[in-house]
Design a protein with these regions (language model features):
Chain A
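Charge-rich, well-structured scaffold segments of protease-associated domains
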Residues: 4-6, 10, 21, 65-216, ...
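M16/MPP (pitrilysin/insulinase) zinc-metallopeptidase core fold and M16-derived inactive scaffolds
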Residues: 24, 29-93, 265-283, 296
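A short local loop/turn or secondary-structure capping micro-motif enriched for an aromatic residue
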Residues: 26-28, 99, 252
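Active-site-flanking beta-strand signature of metal-NTP-handling nucleotidyl enzymes
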Residues: 29-33, 242-245, 402-403
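Acidic, glycine-rich loop-and-beta core segments that form the ion-binding/anion-interacting portion
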Residues: 225, 237-239, 244-245
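A conserved active-site cap/scaffold subdomain adjacent to cofactor or substrate pockets
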Residues: 251-268
Length: 411, 403
């Protein structure tokens, strides 16, 4: 296997720069991980994080929107960006010879011009994106369940905002949000793959020299889940969609490895407990569980999709499985299988520089530490049934929110 | 590439640096070979195969794959069904033995049949909640007069009428080594792969029915009325088939049209006019035939304008592309090739598809050389001589787009 080296540095302006270097890799991936998202939006700013993510590609002092698109394509870059509740990430992968040029471009983009005419054009694109997701019931379900589960906690806010908030958004609001959140000490620049560390670090320093520090505070209010069952008819759904959301573990918590494997035992799509109780007998088309990690807390999510006629039966069976898991824990054999599958996945997660970049950047953004995929594998392979048992002692699934989105004629 | 005595073709691409391995088994069982009265059979069969094989029941079978750490994906498509697996090389022989059971010795048990049917019916119903996919399925159906237009998901009536006996008959008639493909990529030795393939799949018998010839309808418009937020728009154009002299020129033309964010469709439809969030064109092919589809989703009041810009941009290709556009398209294709070469799963999938479509596997180097070989003059001569025009046009939503 190739030799990996980890390097890290903090620039005078507070920007953290990290790299997992593999001189044999055929590509280089790099990205800015900005610790900002919908949870950091003030009243009236709903959706600004995501709208700004779009505006970042619409030009800077030095570049027009066309220049930006053209330059990415001249490098043949595979690039994109995404926004969630807590992070906004801009990334790209290129052949190693283009890495300095990609760094120059991405760094420049972090200081967007936010031109008024581009702002108006992009507002329409965002409204189209909101409309697109309204045609996708599983997304509507996720957004509503997130809102219901988190209540008054900032993680309840919709990432896309609402049609109303986007229609009312001003350029000045976006500029103020940018000034508050895109400060270097609130960002991580990460590299993975084939690169020259000294060259990249020097270039990053030069490109970001004018960036000034800021506070970028984030609220962590207390949160207590409120178990209940909710149900909404939706006129664009022909199937029934459901989630169970239960308290899990934070992105930096040691319990996260056990929590991920526990979710697999429950809801691996090929061989989890829910598969055999629900999909194998044909009650639902999809049954999955996963563990979602945030900064100070986490959630277990069970997702179901299928024939609305089976709603009661499915609901009862899921609750039965969750209770059984809480009462009896997991068996040694099923834990071994889930561990092995995770270990294999980690090998494949290491194949491409881009995939490595996500692991590296996300992990570091939350923990402030480098965690090699091999280290993750070791943690997972050392799990014993009692580690999972300890998580279950808190009876997380007894505090689950159950949310159903059903066709309008089943309401 | 190597062909076993029973007709199974095997391709191996070693990635010496890769600690993992992926393989894809492609069986030419898809919607194109579903009899008209049994639409959806290929898809149902794929689900049913997993309900026990060889000495193991369904659960023991899944457990055995898990014990090898196998990550798996499988599914039926228009022309074939694929079974893909990713795992560590030391488990390859044991995993292939399990897949040999699945393909050659499935139980296809009566008591699982009703749940297989229930899943198929739910999959079909779920299409109603995925407007873009629903439109593209219908677009294919409208454009092809041959079985290439048949829906992979089947139809309510055909799924409801299916019997275990009929589906077992489909298995016997269509699953076999002849026409099937095993492609392997990753940290493996090709000779070792061949030895293992021979050992576990060498006794697989049977031949797949040969694929039907492509026939098209006359280009026309259609509309599906549905209460959606966005109107879905789809276009279907004839294109050159894989293996054709102009194949790589056509691929570069699509890259100019819809490769990166400086491509024509993205620039004109989204960046300049803000008409959509999603707009794209993608090349497609079935054995012996190539096509181009374009897609956009937009709110009803902007649907007509969106369609007009899309059609105009696609027709404008006939006037040629610039040197800068071609250069960007080439560097984009080159980067895609290098990046896909990092992934064993992507390579195994591409090799398997090559063997099915072209009857040979292309290396990344060969594709790159062919792409780089297309000059501006050659591309523009192709575009002028074979313009993209006269498409099939479909819409789904609350308003119909029209001329």
């Amino acid at each position: 296997m190739s030799v990996l080296t980890f390097r890290e540095a903090t620039l005078p302006n507070g920007l953290r720069v990290i790299a997992e270097i593999n001189r044999e890799a055929k590509s280089t991936a790099l990205g800015y991980f900005v610790r900002t998202g919908s949870r950091d939006e003030l009243a009236g700013e709903e959706g600004v994080s995501h709208f700004l993510e779009h505006m970042v590609f619409k030009g800077t002092e030095r570049r027009s929107a066309w220049d930006v698109n053209r330059e990415f394509d001249e490098m043949g870059a595979k690039y994109n960006a995404f926004t969630n509740e807590e992070l906004t990430v801009f990334y790209g992968a290129v052949l190693p010879e283009f890495a300095p040029r990609l760094l120059d471009l991405l760094s420049d983009l972090m200081r967007p011009a936010l031109r008024e005419d581009e702002f108006e054009t992009e507002r329409k694109v965002i409204l189209e994106e909101i409309a697109l997701y309204r045609d996708r019931p599983h997304f509507v379900l996720y957004e509503r369940a997130q809102e219901a589960y988190f209540g008054r906690h900032p993680l309840a806010k919709p990432v896309l905002g609402t049609t109303e908030s986007i229609e009312a958004m001003t350029r000045a609001q976006m500029a103020a949000y940018h000034a508050r959140r895109y400060v270097p000490n609130n960002m991580t620049l990460a590299f993975a793959g084939n690169l020259d560390w000294d060259e990249m670090l020097a270039l990053a320093e030069r490109m970001t020299r004018g960036w000034t520090r800021g506070a970028a505070p984030r609220n962590h209010p207390g949160f207590t889940p409120e178990p209940r069952r909710l149900r909404t008819p939706y006129d664009k759904a022909s199937q029934a969609y459901a989630v169970f959301v239960a308290p899990g573990h934070a992105a930096a918590a040691e319990e996260r490895y056990a929590a991920r494997v526990l979710a697999d035992v429950l809801g691996d799509p090929d061989n989890g407990r829910l598969f055999w109780r629900l999909v194998d007998p044909g009650l639902v088309e999809t049954a999955m569980a996963y563990h979602h990690e945030y900064e100070e807390l986490g959630t277990f999510l069970v997702y179901l999709q299928g024939d609305p006629a089976h709603e009661e039966e499915v609901s009862a069976r899921v609750r039965e499985e969750l209770q059984r898991l809480e009462k009896r824990g997991v068996e040694a054999e099923e834990l071994e299988r889930a561990k092995l599958k995770t270990a294999t996945s980690l090998v494949f997660a290491g194949e491409t520089s881009l995939s490595r970049l996500f692991y590296l950047g996300m992990g570091y953004s939350y923990t402030g530490r480098y965690e090699a995929l091999d280290t993750v594998r070791r943690w997972v392979m050392h799990l014993e049934p009692y580690h999972l048992g300890e998580l279950l002692e808190a009876r997380p699934f007894s505090r689950a929110l159950e949310y159903w989105l059903v066709p309008a004629d089943h309401g | 590439m190597h062909t076993l005595d029973n007709g199974l073709r095997v391709a191996v691409e070693p990635q010496p640096w890769n600690p993992g391995l992926s393989f894809t088994i492609l069986v030419p069982v898809g919607a194109t070979s579903d009899p008209e009265e049994r639409l959806g059979a290929a898809s149902m069969l794929e689900t049913w195969l997993w309900k026990g094989a060889g000495p193991r029941g369904a659960r023991a079978f899944a457990d055995a794959l898990d014990a090898l750490g196998v990550r798996r994906q499988s599914g039926a498509g228009v022309e074939y069904t694929t079974f893909s697996a990713s795992l560590l090389p030391e488990g390859f022989s044991a995993a292939l033995e399990l897949y040999a059971d699945l393909l050659m010795r499935p139980h296809l048990p009566d008591d699982a049949f009703e749940s297989v049917r229930a899943l198929a019916l739910q999959e079909l119903a779920a299409l109603e909640d995925q407007p873009p996919r629903k439109l593209l399925v219908r677009l294919r159906r409208e454009a092809f007069a041959s079985p290439h237009g048949q829906p992979v998901e089947g139809e309510r009536e055909t799924l409801e009428r299916m019997t275990p006996e009929a589906l077992r008959g489909e298995y016997r008639r269509r699953y076999g080594a002849g026409g099937s493909v095993l492609a392997v990529s990753g940290g493996v030795d090709p000779d070792e792969v061949l030895r293992i393939a021979e050992k576990h799949l060498g006794a697989w018998s049977g031949d797949a029915p040969s694929p039907p010839a492509v026939r098209l309808t006359v280009p026309h418009r259609f509309h599906i009325e549905q209460e959606t937020e966005q109107v879905q728009i789809g276009l279907f154009y004839k294109d050159v088939p894989p293996g054709h002299y102009d194949f790589y020129a056509s691929r570069l033309a699509v890259a100019v049209l819809s490769g990166g964010m400086s491509s024509r469709l993205f620039t004109e439809v989204r960046e300049k006019r803000g008409l959509v969030y999603a707009v794209s064109a993608s090349p497609g092919s079935v054995k012996g035939f190539g096509y181009l589809t374009a897609y956009a989703g937009t709110m009803p009041e902007r649907a007509q304008a969106t369609l007009e810009v899309m059609e105009e941009e696609i027709e404008r290709l006939a006037q040629g592309v610039t040197r800068e556009e071609l250069d960007r398209a080439k560097v984009g294709v080159r980067a895609d090739l290098v990046l896909s070469g990092e992934s064993s799963r992507a390579r195994a999938g591409a090799l398997a598809r090559d063997l099915f479509i072209l009857d040979r596997a292309r290396s990344l180097e060969e594709v790159e050389a062919e792409v780089m070989d297309v000059t501006l003059e050659r591309l523009n001569a192709f575009l002028a001589g074979r313009p993209y025009r006269d498409p099939w046009i479909g819409s789904l939503g609350t308003v119909e787009v029209g001329p």
